[in-house]
Design a protein with these regions (language model features):
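Basic/polar phosphate-binding segments, predominantly the helix-turn-helix DNA-binding elements
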Residues: 2-3, 9, 19-21, 27-63, ...
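Short helix-to-turn junction characteristic of helix-turn-helix DNA-binding domains
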Residues: 20-23, 71-75
Length: 119
């Protein structure tokens, strides 16, 4: 939805964002995203960064961590949330989560717990 509003439905970057958001649990490669957008890797990276202010990998990581944060707030365990958004290692997920949010996933979940059915 965000991507369509920001870039229009036919935009290659918008399609890439939609693909990533629909497949957060799957491995993502820049080469695959560039091929889907019919661009070279360098052109895709440049256009993606112009459109989002983040590199494609930073954007994917941010989407995954944001989605996981909402799942944790909604009652998922840290492990469930990490696996659900494509992390194979809970420790790597926890390190990256803490880097982005300034606290561990457990601390964040305790401080941001949502009533059941909201997330």
């Amino acid at each position: 939805y965000f991507a369509r509003r920001a870039f229009g439905p036919g935009n290659a970057i918008a399609r890439s964002i939609a693909h990533v958001s629909s497949n957060l649990d799957a491995p993502v490669s820049i080469d695959d995203l560039a091929a889907r957008a019919h661009m070279s890797r360098a052109a895709f990276h440049r256009k993606f960064k112009q459109a989002t202010t983040m590199s494609p990998i930073q954007f994917v990581k941010s989407m995954r961590l944001n989605t996981a944060a909402m799942k944790i707030a909604g009652g998922f365990t840290v492990n469930e949330a990490a696996m659900d958004v494509g992390y194979l290692s809970t420790s790597q997920f926890s390190r990256e989560f803490k880097r982005m949010y300034g606290q561990s996933p457990r601390q964040w979940g305790a401080a941001h717990h949502l009533p059941s059915g909201v997330a």
